[in-house]
């Protein structure tokens, strides 16, 4: 199979004031905000409704209901597994060319008629501003579709085997035998789409459980995939609780893989559950997960102060710090802080927090009440600690929306609680170190947290940067030099980390797709032996 279709990154729309793009998105936002959508399960292409329902709300106006989604129970899970089994019989044998045609069509739909719908749903249900929605729900997911199709073709075209005379050796890239369980997070619509679609592209079937706090954009994605031509049952859509959906799925003998993004604790529970049931499965399940992070910024004394201030504000506070890659701890030399502090605080003071409908708001609301309570507990802890000082923010209000102002903590303790634990909110903790302690500080960066997802080092001293790159080899799966630790782009920076941050299977790369295939080696012999005797058996 060959193709001349080379993927390119989707251009990011700017949505500047007065532009048609901005006006159209605002119209779609207002239209969807005025509706209350009923969201069914999708099993075998059919809408399924249940007695138990959950609500889609605006985090920035949590009394405003956007939709009611039906929740799966034991019966619906059983139906979905059976639907997946039946769909697998046909889909697993569907030629790659037909599969890529469907997902390239999905990319075209998202580039065009579905773009405003998916972006607006993301803004409304996840409280993302227009730019954050655009780079996620539109551009990144379009890139996932297009680049994954190219990578899948590259995989299938790869036949590296030697074939001696009279023999033909080949590799067959089969899908897994069974179904993949895709468990998706609230924070990225693109990841929510990619987790079931990447295995499906490789010929697998998937059961998709979206995060309950972000069902709305996921529902529109499954509708868009249907329009793109995805056959019924290839991806079954099952909103519901973790226990009612996850427990029966994870113990089913036909489970062939798990594609997960979420908390480290949940991923560890999944892994333990699979381990306890390992003798039940028809095949060993592939386990792919991207989990938590405690992402760092290490500044060298040679750093440009303006660049550092911008990286800190964007890296820590875009999308309210609810990115697995968000900067959460920073190590700043004391002599840099003297110059940085006023610039950083002045810039931070200009940051506006509010509804994404107001395009001048840089930050919006955190996702839900549980997140709000968890994040503010860390702020309260810092306020009451002799080892910490809050120098910005520290204020919050959940009366209308779950709003938390960008909060900066200075600590004298490099092992302070907010330096070690994942907060997943707009809280950045800074530890000031003496420039002479550069080497010791690299050790702190490496050893303070169990995570190893992203991190950045900033400075103009090339020798120091090279030394940090070597010393922090296993501290981050995505390592940024003179840039914030967020914003990985498909086709440019494959994303993932190790240690407590996941299996580092690099979403948006060929490496991830290889987890969803089971290779068969085929040897065809044209001159088959007819005598068992080898020459060495001859008598002297």
Regions found by a protein language model. Name each.
Residues 63, 99, 122, 203, ...:
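Residue-level signal for inorganic ion chemistry
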Residues 2-4, 10-14, 61-67, 86, ...:
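Conserved C-terminal structural/oligomerization subdomain of aldehyde/semialdehyde dehydrogenase
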Residues 224-229, 251-253, 257, 264-414, ...:
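ALDH superfamily catalytic-core signature
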Residues 49-51, 57, 62-156, 442, ...:
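Glycine-rich loop-to-alpha-helix module at the N-terminal edge of alpha/beta enzyme cores
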Residues 123, 142, 152-307, 504:
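Rossmann-like NAD(P) dinucleotide-binding subdomain of oxidoreductase/dehydrogenase enzymes
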Residues 58, 70, 134-137, 184-185, ...:
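Active-site proximal loops enriched in glycine and acidic residues that flank catalytic Cys/His/Asp
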Residues 1-65:
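Hydrophobic face of amphipathic alpha-helices that form TPR/SEL1-like repeat modules
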Residues 129, 165, 206-209, 294-298, ...:
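Short beta-alpha connecting loops at secondary-structure transitions
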